[in-house]
Structures are given as C-alpha cells and as structure tokens.
Design a protein with these regions (language model features):
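Membrane topogenic/interface segments and analogous intrinsically disordered interaction regions
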Residues: 2-288
C-alpha cells in the first residue's frame, strides 16, 4: 500500500515538473521574438525622436539666438555674473563679441537639421533609457533589478547635470580663451559655424559623460573591480589629475575659473567614494 502511494506521489511530482518545464518553455522567447521586441522598441524610439525633432526644428532659430550662440556675446549670463563678483581676480574684456561666419552654401541648412536632431536626442534621452530598461528587465534577476533601476534614474539625472555644467561653465570659458588667443596681431579670428557647433556639442556631451563617474564607480564596485579603500588611498593623486583636467578644460589661466570647473569634478570624486561599496568589508562582517 505504501509502495503504491509513493508511486502515485512520484508520478504527480513528475507530472508537475513536466508541466512547469512546459510552461517555462512556452513563456521563454526565441531569438526572433527578442528581435521583434527590439524592433518595436527602436521603432517607438524613432517615432518619439521624430516628433520631438519637429518641435526643435521649428524652435531652432529662437534656440540658436537665445542659447546656442549666447556664449559669443559679452552679455552671456555667466560673463555678467563673473564681472559682478570677480573684482580684480577675473578680468573679462568688455568688447567681447564674436561674429560667426558661414562659408558653405548648405551649411546653415545642414546645421539646422543636425542641431535639431542632437537636441531632440538629448530631450528624448530618458525615453531611450526607459525603452532599454523595458527590453533588458525580463532577463534580470530580482537583485539585479533592485540595483540597476536606481542606477538608470541616477545616470539620467547626472547626464543632464553634466550637460548643464558644460553649457554654463566649461564651454564659455574654453571658447572665450581660444577666441581671444592671438598668435600674432596681424591674424584675425573668423569662427566658422561648423567649427563652433562641433566644439559646442563636444564639450557639453563630454561633461555629460564625465558626470557619469559616480555611476561607473558604483557599477565597478558591484563587480568587485573597484573598492572604497582604493579611492581614499589615492585621493591626493586624484586631486592632482582633476586640477590638470580642469586646467586643460579652462585654459584661461586665472584661478577663479579654474576652481569653477575643478569643484564639480572634485565633488564627483567624493560622490564616487560615497556610493562605492567595499565588498571585502561586507564579506568580513558576514564571516564574523
């Protein structure tokens, strides 16, 4: 009797196992199913980008005059602010006013399109991140979802903050120094539109990427590659590197503008120390 009961229980367990495996196989997506999901994600992202681009294209003349070309005039808000508080430390010339020239027939039209796409991509960045998250979330474990969800949000915020710092601090000082630099009095600077846009876009996006440093440090610590003790031990070396980086970004020579760029970089380093998790200490506590 007991033998028959055990046989029935084994058959039921086997049946349940087979049913579970069948459900998992049914719920599992094939390679082509994943491609289909990715295709629709890319399609939705392209539609969102196109809609936003229409808006940025229409508003681009206003955006160009009020924001993109604003650092070419001495009336730019950061210049006025420095003149009001700088005193004798910061000396900005009062006649700074650069005229951007165009040397190609189609350059203005192509710049209109390219800047509209770039600005639309920056505005749509959170939506792109959301689509990426939706695509990879089903393949993640619960613990990974718990860690990566705030990372995606924090990375987006830090990217926008970095772009804002790049626009308000890094680009104006770098641009002003390079424009006012004269190898010879007989040479007149004439800034080409494409050259201006390339530098404008590059410096702002670079600062957006640099502001991902705490997120990168945190992710490296999760994999055991980076430790809090390492960042603390080499803090003095990092300060020197950050000062050199700030001097390269803002080659104007005065300490005030140097500090305006160095301080955000140093704050990012301190944030990296705060967010990094030292796995070794955690394992030692668990062993105790």
């Amino acid at each position: 009797m007991n033998y028959e009961l055990l046989s029935v229980m084994e058959l039921e367990d086997k049946s349940k196992t087979e049913q579970t495996e069948a459900e998992e196989q049914e719920g599992a997506m094939s390679f082509w199913d994943h491609l289909e999901v990715l295709r629709w994600a890319l399609f939705r992202s392209a539609c969102v980008l196109a809609v936003i681009m229409v808006g940025t294209f229409i508003a681009m003349p206003y955006i160009f005059d009020r924001f993109i070309l604003a650092p070419t005039s001495n009336d730019f808000f950061i210049y006025r602010w420095l003149n009001s508080i700088g005193g004798g430390i910061v000396k900005l010339s009062s006649d700074f006013d650069v005229q951007i020239i165009n040397i190609n027939v189609a350059s203005q039209f192509m710049t209109h399109i390219s800047t509209s796409i770039s600005l639309a991509a920056v505005i749509a960045f959170p939506y792109f991140i959301w689509e990426i998250w939706k695509f990879i979330e089903p393949a993640l474990f619960e613990d990974e979802v718990k860690h990566l969800r705030p990372a995606f949000l924090g990375g987006t915020i830090m990217f926008y903050l970095g772009c804002a710092i790049g626009y308000a601090r890094v680009f104006p000082f770098t641009y002003r120094f390079l424009v006012e630099y004269n190898l010879s009095p007989s040479i007149t600077n004439q800034i080409n539109l494409q050259s201006y846009i390339d530098n404008f876009t590059m410096l702002i996006l670079v600062m957006g990427i640099v502001f991902e440093m705490p997120l990168l440090a945190w992710l490296l610590s999760l994999f055991g590659i980076l430790r809090k003790s390492f960042l603390r031990e080499y803090k003095r070396h990092a300060v020197v590197v950050l000062l050199i980086s700030a001097a390269i970004i803002t080659p104007s020579g005065d300490p005030f503008t140097l500090m305006l760029v160095f301080i955000p970089l140093y704050v990012l380093y301190e944030l990296s120390i705060l967010v990094v998790k030292d796995k070794k200490k955690k394992e030692d506590k668990e062993d105790d």
